Amino acid sequence: MELTPREKDKLLLFTAALLAERRLARGLKLNYPEAVALISAAVLEGARDGRTVAELMSLGREVLTREQVMPGIAEMLHDVQVEATFPDGTKLVTVHDPIV
C-alpha cells in the first residue's frame, strides 16, 4: 500500500485517537498527546461528514471536559489546529480553548 506523507499523518492521528477513546472507556484520564489526537480526529471526521469550519470549531470544544484529562492539561492546551479536507479544498480549523 502506497501512502502519501499526509495520509500517513492522518492514519497515525486516527490510531492515537482510537487509543485515547479506549483509555477514556477504561476510565483513564488523557494526557496531552491523547487529548490533541482525540480533538483533531473529531474535527477531521466532522469535515469528512460535511460540517462547516464554524461547526467544527464549536464541535472541538465539546469533545473533552476537564474531568477527562490529567491535571494541568486543559491549561496547557490553548489551541488545536487541524488541516481538514472539505469538498471545496483544504482548510485550517482552529479550536480555541478546546477543553472546558
Curated annotation (Swiss-Prot):
On subunit structure and binding partners, the annotation says: Heterotrimer of UreA (gamma), UreB (beta) and UreC (alpha) subunits. Three heterotrimers associate to form the active enzyme.
Say if the entry is tagged with keyword Hydrolase.
yes
Record's keyword terms, sorted: Cytoplasm, Hydrolase
Return the InterPro entries for the record.
Urease_gamma, Urease_gamma/gamma-beta_su, Urease_gamma_sf, Urease_subunit
Q: What are its E.C. numbers? A: 3.5.1.5
Report the NCBIfam families cross-referenced here.
Answer: PRK13241.1 (NF009712), urease_gam (TIGR00193)
Q: Sorted alphabetically, which Gene3D superfamilies does this protein's record hold?
A: Urease, gamma-like subunit
Q: Which CDD domains match?
A: Urease_gamma
Give the highest taxon in the source lineage.
Bacteria
Q: In which pathway does it act?
A: Nitrogen metabolism; urea degradation; CO(2) and NH(3) from urea (urease route): step 1/1
Q: Which family does it belong to?
A: Belongs to the urease gamma subunit family.
- One GO location term (cellular component): cytoplasm
One molecular function GO term is: urease activity
Q: Which organism is it from?
A: Pseudomonas putida (strain ATCC 47054 / DSM 6125 / CFBP 8728 / NCIMB 11950 / KT2440)
Q: Where in the cell is it found?
A: Cytoplasm
Supply the name of the protein: Urease subunit gamma
Query: What GO biological process terms does the UniProt entry carry, in alphabetical order?
Result: urea catabolic process
Chemical reaction(s) catalysed: urea + 2 H2O + H(+) = hydrogencarbonate + 2 NH4(+)
